């Protein structure tokens, strides 16, 4: 198994995304450019449940600040990304063919700073303290078959919503790899 950790990472050197105007109901998904989230992440991509760009991404209430401005207030600063405090991942495959992946990351509370005409400033929380977790167990079987269990979990401090998703994936092949059946439950 391999252990990777990062403490207060600075992804400032990472290539930025092109601006895209999305008028549809679904978010635009960008490729991951941060090396910590691209290296050794094959297990975490199973089932397509984990989108790493949300970790340390745009604060949950980034756009709500405009609706919370008082009379004669202007926005002084509104960070576009929640600051990542740490991230840890353990991944690898045991001799039994069991793939194990554990991921944990914490992003700090994020605040916008607003100021009124009298130079009185106040903070508006745009993202709570957030903990991201993923557990993946992937058992390889004979004939290139496999069964996987994936759990993703997001815990936020305060009144903001949490998320917990679990799924079981399966992929079965016959001896000659002629026939395949696969699917998921979750």
Residues covered by each model-derived region:
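Outer-membrane beta-barrel channel domains
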Residues: 1-186
């Amino acid at each position: 198994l391999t252990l990777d950790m990062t403490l207060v990472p600075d992804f400032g050197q990472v290539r930025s995304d092109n601006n895209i105007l999305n008028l549809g109901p679904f978010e635009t998904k960008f490729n991951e450019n941060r090396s910590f989230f691209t290296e050794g992440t094959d297990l975490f991509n199973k089932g397509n449940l984990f989108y790493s760009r949300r970790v340390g991404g745009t604060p949950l209430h980034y756009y709500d600040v405009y609706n919370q401005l008082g009379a004669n207030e202007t926005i002084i600063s509104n960070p576009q990304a929640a600051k990542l405090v740490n991230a840890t991942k353990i991944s690898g495959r045991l001799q039994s063919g069991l793939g194990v992946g554990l991921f944990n990351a914490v992003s700090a509370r994020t605040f916008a700073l607003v100021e009124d005409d009298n130079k009185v400033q106040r903070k508006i929380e745009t993202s709570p303290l957030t903990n991201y977790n993923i557990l993946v167990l992937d058992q390889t079987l004979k004939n290139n078959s496999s069964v996987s269990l994936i759990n993703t979990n997001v815990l936020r401090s305060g009144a903001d919503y949490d998320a917990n998703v679990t799924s079981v994936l399966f992929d079965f092949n016959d001896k000659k790899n002629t026939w395949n059946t696969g699917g998921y439950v979750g």
